[in-house]
Design a protein with these regions (language model features):
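Conserved N-proximal alpha/beta basic substrate-recognition cap immediately N-terminal to
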Residues: 2-104
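Glycine-rich phosphate-binding loop of ATP-grasp-fold ATP-dependent ligases
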Residues: 91-92, 111-137, 162-163, 186-205
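ATP-grasp fold ATP-binding core
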Residues: 92, 105-127, 145-158, 239, ...
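Phosphate-binding site of ATP-dependent enzymes
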Residues: 109, 133-191, 242-255
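A short catalytic or substrate-binding loop motif that flags glycine-/basic-rich loops and adjacent residues
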Residues: 118-119, 155-159, 231-235, 312-314
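A long amphipathic alpha-helix within ATP-dependent nucleotide-binding catalytic cores
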Residues: 147, 189-251, 289-290, 294-305
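ATP-dependent carboxylate/phosphate-activation module, predominantly the ATP-grasp catalytic core
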Residues: 166-223, 232, 259-285
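Peripheral (often C-terminal) accessory segments that flank ATP-dependent C-N-forming ligase machineries
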Residues: 276-324
Length: 324
């Protein structure tokens, strides 16, 4: 490969022995393309790199994945999950094609978050707690003009942001793959991941919600995802959730967002599992600007202190694990 910082690469290979070779991005026969997520744009980029059309999804398959990625899928799955549970979870988001009822709801003191139907990772959000009613309505109308509708959901006081990770098959199966625990802004914009084993994440969530409820939600989600992915999508899925502090007690919003693609949570889960020393308090984040001062402390092929640069050094932004 060209253009890779040799000093960074040699240190990664020496410290961690990741068991993989660095290779260029040119297609070789027999390779199975696996982009971060499937879209018309990612398929076109792969085609430009020499990947033959027969190795790529058809245009019809890409259209089905795009429809699956609409936020109304999360609302549908929330309803399917709620129907399987003997305890309450947060209400599903509502798709709105007009703003007629919004002024009365805001006047009554309700607080909402409006979301663009095709958006993710905390982008495309409008929080009524952070703007005037007039601004909220005007921006919501802009969402309708841009994407035909918006999703409206209650704005909660969140005490925990986490995700359940799944592997889905278009044949109609879905397997739980682990947890992700992350930090967000009050409106839900992603900032960083904690790198912890699943058992520790579940223990932290159990401060608010019994493990039995988490397991029931996990099973209900697997059933619901298997249903909506059948004959449409095979690959990783990350279901973002939150635990809200409400007058009714702590409440799980089980489908804040569903990402039918690779996610930062899946990356964090893999990093925690393979490269972080058990018991270390590690965090995975994207750092703007240079991170040339990253200095790792490595024991037995595991990061035990300091910070580790996960990509060749860049002056623009860097993926970093920090401990402490």
């Amino acid at each position: 490969a060209t253009g890779v910082d040799a000093r960074w690469y040699d240190r990664i290979m020496a410290d961690f022995e990741p068991g993989t070779e660095l290779f260029d991005h040119n297609y070789r026969p027999g390779m199975q393309p696996a982009p971060w997520g499937w879209s018309a744009a990612s398929a076109a980029l792969l085609r430009q790199q020499g990947v033959p059309q027969e190795a790529l999804p058809t245009a019809e398959a890409l259209d089905r994945i795009r429809l699956l990625s609409h936020r109304r899928t999360a609302a549908t799955v929330q309803g399917l999950v709620a129907a399987q549970l003997p305890f309450p979870i947060a209400d599903a988001a509502v798709e709105c094609t007009a703003v007629d009822a919004i002024p009365l709801l805001l006047k009554a003191g309700r607080q909402f978050i409006a979301k663009l139907p095709w958006s993710s990772s905390g982008r495309g959000l409008l929080d009524s707690r952070k703007c005037s009613p007039e601004h909220f309505i005007r921006q919501a109308e802009g969402m309708i003009h841009s994407q035909g509708s918006f999703m409206l959901e209650t704005a909660y006081e969140r005490v925990a942001d986490f995700a359940m990770l799944f592997d889905c098959e278009a044949s109609g199966s879905c397997r739980f793959a682990g947890y992700s625990l992350f930090d967000t802004t009050p409106s839900g914009q992603y900032t960083s991941n904690l790198l912890l084993p699943d058992s520790e994440i579940e223990s932290r969530l159990a401060q608010y919600v019994p493990c039995e409820q988490l397991h029931a939600i996990q099973q209900a989600l697997a059933t619901a995802l298997a249903k909506v992915c059948r004959e449409v999508y095979s690959g990783p899925a990350g279901v973002d959730m939150l635990i809200a502090d409400t007058p009714r007690g702590f409440l799980v919003d089980a489908t804040v967002e569903i990402n039918f693609r690779m996610t930062m949570g899946r990356v964090a889960h893999t990093l925690a599992e393979r490269y972080v020393m058990p018991g270390a308090e590690a965090r995975f984040k994207v750092v703007s600007g240079s991170a040339s001062d990253a200095t790792p402390v490595v024991d037995a092929r595991r990061l035990s202190g300091g910070s580790l640069l996960l990509n060749p050094p860049s002056p623009h932004f860097n993926f970093v694990i920090q401990i402490g």
